[in-house]
């Protein structure tokens, strides 16, 4: 999949109606938006369209999982004033996203108008399947999906996608708008530029840091990374499955992934054949229970982990080893924490890795944080602007790193 796509800055927007797929899937509480980060992230793309003389901007998004029917708590209406506030301009909310009323409102609007459509996922056609209010499974026919996509297409002259977080989903709003120019917005463009830098043309040594719980969840990621990287750090819960298989280490009550265990030796053989250095933890912070007030002690591969105890973070020697590996890398992709960072007692390893990645960035390395938990760590320790790129899409970035095609990216016009 080529990651170089037509960008909004390559398109003449003057006098055009610009239809933008944004990601306004924001956290809500009691009908109020509790975090406006995703809205703020889309503002530069919206502002750019208006500054370049777009006749109108039509914003479409999903919110939550209403499963193909109207659910009031998932309405985008409360999001509208927040968009307006951040944009510094009035935004008109439309009570649906398709149908004659919406098409008429967007047909010939006053120049400079901005509209926000109601939640795309109130229609089963957006995702293709859903669940009815009474709990039965529902499914849209190909003709229904086509009609839904055509109705969305009528709302603009140019299509822009800025919803990287949904790019791995072949939903109607992501792949169905058949306008002559389908460009990426600034957010999507930044994601694609950084991932292309790492996956298509990395400066070496190229290091992947992989954490998280299960080997079996990350197997495609590990296999694809072995084709690309020079070094690989494996931390988090999945390290115990590796250590038990390779060193026959006693891991106590630590996470063990039986299906994942079957592929450990294959991974090690592939790494050897491809000349990839794999780095595993050599010591651990262990705990007698999964809690902040647990008793802890440091254990090694040799000593093993006592029965009833579990490894919840990497130990001081491992931190020292991993820091050396991180400091010599020129390109770093990080997906998954080193330990249970949500509890301060077991956050030391992840925090140390983060500090080292920040240092590497200062020294000129390109550092990319895959979405999900690792992005949460950046927010927790305020390092979002101290690394090259924090991905906004957990699932989408994981699929890119696994070497998969992203339907929402494939659907965009290629850069000339």
Curated annotation (Swiss-Prot):
| Keyword annotations from UniProtKB, A to Z | ATP-binding, Glycolysis, Kinase, Magnesium, Metal-binding, Nucleotide-binding, Transferase
Annotated residues for binding of CDP? 212, 217, 236, 336, 341
Residues reported in the UniProt entry to bind AMP: 213-214, 218, 237, 311, 342
Q: Where does (2R)-3-phosphoglycerate bind?
A: 22-25, 37-38, 61-62, 64-65, 120-121, 168-169
InterPro entries in the record: Phosphoglycerate_kinase (IPR001576), Phosphoglycerate_kinase_CS (IPR015911), Phosphoglycerate_kinase_N (IPR015824), Phosphoglycerate_kinase_sf (IPR036043)
Keyword Metal-binding on this protein? yes
User: Which reaction is the catalytic activity of this chain?
Assistant: (2R)-3-phosphoglycerate + ATP = (2R)-3-phospho-glyceroyl phosphate + ADP
According to its UniProt record, in which pathway does this protein act? Carbohydrate degradation; glycolysis; pyruvate from D-glyceraldehyde 3-phosphate: step 2/5
Its biological function? Involved in the seventh step in glycolysis. Catalyzes the conversion of 1,3-bisphosphoglycerate ((2R)-3-phospho-glyceroyl phosphate) to 3-phosphoglycerate ((2R)-3-phosphoglycerate) and results in the formation of ATP. Associated with the tegument to provide the energy needed for the tegumental repair resulting from immune damage.
Q: Which family does it belong to?
A: Belongs to the phosphoglycerate kinase family.
**Assembly, per entry:** Monomer.
Q: Protein name, please?
A: Phosphoglycerate kinase
């Amino acid at each position: 999949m080529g990651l170089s796509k037509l960008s909004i800055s390559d398109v003449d927007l003057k006098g055009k109606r610009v239809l933008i797929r944004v990601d306004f899937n924001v956290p809500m509480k009691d009908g109020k938006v509790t975090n406006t980060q995703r809205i703020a992230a889309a503002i530069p793309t919206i502002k750019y369209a208006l500054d370049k003389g777009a006749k109108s901007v039509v914003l479409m998004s999903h919110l939550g999982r209403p499963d193909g029917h109207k659910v009031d708590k998932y309405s985008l209406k409360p999001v509208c004033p927040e968009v307006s506030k951040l944009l510094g301009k009035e935004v008109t909310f439309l009570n649906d996203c398709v149908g004659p009323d919406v098409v008429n409102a967007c047909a010939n609007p006053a120049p400079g108008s901005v509209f926000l459509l109601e939640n795309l996922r109130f229609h089963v056609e957006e995702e293709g399947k859903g669940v009815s209010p009474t709990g039965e499974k529902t499914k849209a026919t190909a003709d229904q999906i086509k009609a839904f996509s055509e109705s969305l297409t009528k709302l603009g002259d140019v299509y822009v996608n800025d919803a990287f977080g949904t790019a791995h989903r072949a939903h109607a709003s992501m792949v169905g708008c058949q306008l002559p120019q389908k460009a990426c917005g600034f957010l999507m463009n930044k994601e694609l530029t950084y991932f292309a830098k790492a996956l298509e043309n990395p400066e070496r040594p190229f290091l992947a840091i992989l954490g998280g719980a299960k080997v079996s969840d990350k197997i495609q990621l590990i296999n694809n990374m072995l084709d690309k990287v020079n070094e690989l750090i494996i931390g988090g819960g999945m390290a115990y499955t590796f250590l038990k298989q390779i060193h026959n280490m006693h891991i106590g009550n630590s996470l063990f992934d039986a299906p994942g265990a079957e592929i450990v030796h294959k991974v090690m053989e592939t790494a050897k054949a491809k000349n990839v250095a794999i780095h595993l933890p050599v010591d651990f912070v262990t705990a007698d229970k999964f809690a902040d007030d647990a008793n802890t002690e440091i254990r090694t591969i040799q000593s093993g982990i006592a029965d009833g105890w579990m490894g919840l973070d990497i130990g001081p020697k491992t931190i020292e080893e991993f820091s050396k590996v991180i400091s010599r890398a020129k390109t770093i992709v990080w997906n998954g924490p080193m330990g249970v960072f949500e509890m301060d007692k077991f956050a030391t390893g992840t925090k140390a890795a983060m500090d080292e990645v920040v240092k590497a960035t200062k020294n000129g390395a390109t550092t990319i944080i895959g979405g999900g938990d690792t992005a949460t760590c950046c927010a927790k320790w305020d390092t979002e602007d101290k690394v090259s790129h924090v991905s906004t899409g957990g699932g989408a970035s994981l699929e890119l790193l696994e070497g998969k095609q992203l339907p929402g990216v494939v659907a965009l016009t290629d850069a000339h």
